[in-house]
Amino acid sequence: MGEKLAIVSPKVQTTRHRIKGILTEKNYQIIFSDTPGIIEPKYKLHEKMMQAVKSALEDADLALLIVDVKENWEECDAIFSALKLRVPAIVIINKIDLSDKIKTEAAIAYFTARPYCKKAVTLSALTGINKTKFINALLEFLPEGAPFFDGDDISDLNTRFFVSELIREKIYQLAQDEIPYHTAVIIREYQEKSTLVKIVADIVVHRETQKAILIGDKGSMIKRLGMLARKDIEDFIQHKVFLELFVKVKPKWRENELYLREYGY
């Protein structure tokens, strides 16, 4: 697609929504659904996330099961087997740029032998190694049909959503421990002016102590967070941005159905 549509972070459970990415070329259109990772729900937010996974699997023509070539394959196999997929699945063995040929070939052999795996494909999402082979493998299993989206579309979600995700990404990068998992970002204002785009956003946390940490000493943390987020937002929308951030406390918002609806879950 040529755009970053999801948060990039070494922390787990960063994706909370089902995000569709649309790849349109001359002879095909592929709609990718990025979903939250599969977890045992502990609160209502987790339940919403797992509903997004279930919905994506029910709608899909093909499941892409992504595994890091250096991960524990047996653990991945257990997770993939538990999905009880009703559609064909391709196992994507990622990060081959960090592996040797012997390890990569062993991974291919291991997953090809699994009953849910119709094909195993190697890829480096970072460097683009085997990108064409990856796309061709998908086309083998996808049905023919008319395009669902216009050729210029790259996602079914709006700009405000991606702006909120870019802000949330910076929280994952800068904040420690449980704080990223206790935050939500809500865009309160998105106004296009003649010379810039004005964006006002709330960062919602559970506790006053978390608010104090995100604001930082004399506002140092929120200033840095805003500066980094603004740069990425400007790169994304290709326009100068004025970004204003507020930190608000909403105790146990992850368990509150009304808050979850308001925040887009």
Indicate residue ranges for each PLM-predicted region.
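A conserved segment at the C-terminal end of the G1
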Residues: M1-P10
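Conserved, well-folded catalytic cores of nucleic-acid-processing
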Residues: E3, I22-K26, I38, A56, ...
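Charged, alpha-helix-enriched surfaces in structured cytosolic catalytic cores
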Residues: P10, T14, K44-E58, S99-A106, ...
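Conserved nucleotide-binding/hydrolysis micro-motifs of P-loop NTPases
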Residues: V12-T14, P36-I39, V69-W73, I96-S99, ...
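Conserved P-loop/Walker A NTP-binding site and adjacent catalytic elements of P-loop NTPases
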Residues: T15-R16, I22
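Conserved C-terminal guanine-recognition region of P-loop GTPase G domains, centered on the G4
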Residues: G21-S33, E47-V121, L174, Q191-L196
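Canonical P-loop GTPase G-domain recognition
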Residues: V87-I90, I96-F161
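P-loop NTP-binding site
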Residues: T159-Y265
